[in-house]
Amino acid sequence: MKEKVTAVVLAAGKGSRMHSDIQKQYMTLLERPVITYALEAFEDSSVDEVILVVAPGEVEYAQKNILDKYSYKKVKRIVTGGAERYHSVYEALCVIPEENYVLIHDGARAFITPELIEFCIEQVKKYKSCVMGIPVKDTIKIVDDNCYAVSTP
């Protein structure tokens, strides 16, 4: 059997730190939901298929407002996630054949590119495991208990 690469895009999170009624992955960024940028990057990569993981009760919403509206061909299945991220990953892994390579991506992270995806695929095939990280570009401030900036690393 041909080795396939499956991407799991996690979109079941609540984004509670955002203090918004709209989950991060569904917020609008330049007139499109944030999650569409990640899905488009996987669509434009050599990934064979995508499994989208959404919160309970959101399957119909994701199908209509994301998949149908933007016509993603590689999203083969929508899976309902769990209470925690690891539950959602587990639910997706349960529907993927063992011989597949698996990439896991947070759907609220819009700035993944097909080039980064290809790099991950190369590395996971070579080393059997890969974690992608990119340098922080924003200024980071360390604050004290009263939220006063105390230093910039």
Regions found by a protein language model. Name each.
Residues K2-V59:
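N-terminal glycine-rich phosphate-binding loop and ensuing alpha1 helix
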Residues T36, G82, Y86-Y90, P114:
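Glycine-rich phosphate-binding loop at the start of an alpha helix
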Residues H87-Y101:
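Active-site nucleotide-sugar/metal-binding loop of Leloir-type enzymes
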Residues I112-P153:
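Conserved core of the sugar-phosphate nucleotidyltransferase
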Residues E60-I66:
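Acidic helix N-cap motif at the loop->helix transition within catalytic regions
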Residues D68-A83:
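Conserved donor nucleotide-binding strand/loop of the catalytic core
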Residues V9, I35, A92, H105-D106, ...:
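Residue-level signal for inorganic ion chemistry
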Residues A7-V9, L52, I104, S129-M132:
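Structural beta-sheet core signal
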